[in-house]
A protein has these predicted regions:
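N-terminal leader/capping segments at the start of a protein or of a new domain
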Residues: 1-48
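Short acidic-glycine-tyrosine-enriched beta hairpin
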Residues: 113-138
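A short glycine-rich, His/Asp/Glu-containing loop-to-beta-strand
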Residues: 53-84, 128
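A short hydrophobic beta-strand segment most commonly corresponding to one strand
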Residues: 98-100, 146-162
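Asparagine-centered strand-capping/turn motif at beta-strand->loop junctions
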Residues: 140-144
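Mixed-charge, glycine-accented linear interaction segment located at domain edges/termini
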Residues: 164-167
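Glycine- and acidic-residue-biased ligand/ion/polar-headgroup-sensing regions
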Residues: 94-109
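Conserved short histidine dyad/triad with adjacent acidic residue
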Residues: 78-92, 133-134
Length: 171
């Protein structure tokens, strides 16, 4: 995966404000993920939060674009762009996460601690989910033959400081 640097995006202001309010509840990680997921539902961005160039993705791997980092480091908003066939490695996260699909379809596989497949789903435009460790081992795949998928992820950390959201890779 390749990352690009953050740029200010006024279109994200309602989402940033909503996530900030959700995080200020100081709930546990699972509850925070659900609160943030609700803010994503209420303030679902469009693909235009990314530049036309960013929306193209990369032939090498899915792309990550940091869109906002809260000044106190409590959360980051990231746009992920997946060309057809691109996927993540099986991984888990260092903190809570909420995400929404804003273009295309993302196929998600969920795994238990022994890496047994325990669930899978196709997430379409407008589908929103939130989760927190433990129990967040998954892989995401754009299974489309011809459509780029884009999703917005909110992580409970400053991803620019730590270099990403994954805690471990399993494959």
């Amino acid at each position: 995966m390749t990352a690009t640097q953050m740029r200010p995006i006024a279109r994200l202001s309602p989402l940033v404000d909503g996530v900030r309010a959700a995080v200020e509840h100081r709930a546990d990680w699972s509850e925070t993920a659900l609160l943030v997921a609700e803010e994503l539902r209420r303030n679902l961005p469009t693909p235009e939060i990314l530049t036309p160039q960013q929306r193209l993705g990369s032939p090498e791997s899915y792309r990550s674009h940091t869109l906002h980092v809260e000044p106190d480091g409590t959360f980051s908003i990231v746009g992920l762009v997946w060309r057809p066939g691109q996927l993540t490695r099986i991984h888990d996260h260092i903190t809570w996460c909420a995400f929404a699909v804003i273009q295309g379809v993302e196929h998600e596989e969920l795994f238990d601690a022994d890496l047994n497949l325990i669930g899978e789903s196709d997430n379409h435009v407008g589908d929103v989910s939130g989760f927190a460790p433990p129990g967040d081992i998954h892989r995401v795949h754009n299974t489309s033959a011809d459509t780029t998928a884009i999703s917005v992820h909110v992580y409970g950390t400053d991803v620019t400081r730590i270099g990403g959201s994954a805690r471990r890779y399993y494959d």
